[in-house]
Amino acid sequence: DNPTAIATIKKNLQYYANAENIIKLFDKDIRQFHHFYGKSNFTLASDPFVYQSYMDNLFSTSPTPATTEIKLNEIGSSHTNYIMGSTQEADKEWLANSWYSYLKDLAKKLGSQEPSQDRLKDNIKYYVKTTSRIKDNGWISYSIETKKVKFQDTDYTLERRFELVD
């Protein structure tokens, strides 16, 4: 009988109304779950597999170019699971330019002075580490993704983890 509650419920149901909305809700989980699949063949002695990739942008909707390294870290003693690790690091020059563009757009919207070109020298570090325990059947049993941003005197960390239980 509460109209506000009914309106909120109807709005929330729209999130699950079609496949596209559901994919948007779980996109990060899906990407984390499939992060290691099909990238290369790995052994404990092999060098990390390195490739150019993209990661979420901190300042706009366009993806951030990155370098990704993937490595097989461990094989379980019973050979029924293994641990894969990955590090993605954002391209520093691209990130600085994206930061500067964001500041320029913000200054324009606020009607304030455009930022100095010196802001391009701001040291921003943005990386994501993902570690997953994968069963011999290919299913991930546990995964943790740690996103870190280091900028000026601020460190921001966001962890996402999931575990599949039998």
Where do the PLM segments sit?
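Extracytoplasmic beta-rich ectodomain segments of secreted or membrane-anchored proteins
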Residues: I9-I83
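Solvent-exposed N-terminal domain segments of exported/luminal and surface proteins
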Residues: D1-K10
